[in-house]
């Protein structure tokens, strides 16, 4: 039986990335909540771009 989690960085970025969060009102709410909480990484893509460099 195939497991449910089949990791793919492209899908991860496109579904949970920074641009995707900014696209909707609720996504922006998520980002502001994470900023208020002082999260080290706001979204998936912001942490991924740092690891690529």
From Swiss-Prot:
A single Gene Ontology biological process assigned to it is: translation
Q: Does the record's keyword annotation contain Ribonucleoprotein?
A: yes
Q: What is this protein called?
A: Large ribosomal subunit protein bL34
Compositional bias annotation for Basic residues: 1-19, 26-40
Q: Which UniProt keywords apply?
A: Ribonucleoprotein, Ribosomal protein
* Region Disordered, annotated ranges: 1-53
Q: InterPro entries recorded for this chain? A: Ribosomal_bL34, Ribosomal_bL34_CS
Q: Name one GO molecular function term.
A: structural constituent of ribosome
Q: Which PROSITE patterns match?
A: RIBOSOMAL_L34 (PS00784)
Which GO cellular component does the record give, naming just one? ribonucleoprotein complex
Q: Which residue intervals are annotated with compositional bias (Low complexity) in the record?
A: 41-53
In which family does this protein belong, per the annotation?
Belongs to the bacterial ribosomal protein bL34 family.
Concerning Pfam families, the annotation shows: Ribosomal_L34
For whether the record's keyword set contains Ribonucleoprotein, the answer is: yes
């Amino acid at each position: 039986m195939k497991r449910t989690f089949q990791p793919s960085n492209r899908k991860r970025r496109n579904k949970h990335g920074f641009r995707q969060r900014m696209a909707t009102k609720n996504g922006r709410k998520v980002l502001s909540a994470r900023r208020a909480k002082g999260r080290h990484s706001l979204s998936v893509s912001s942490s991924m771009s740092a690891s690529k460099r």
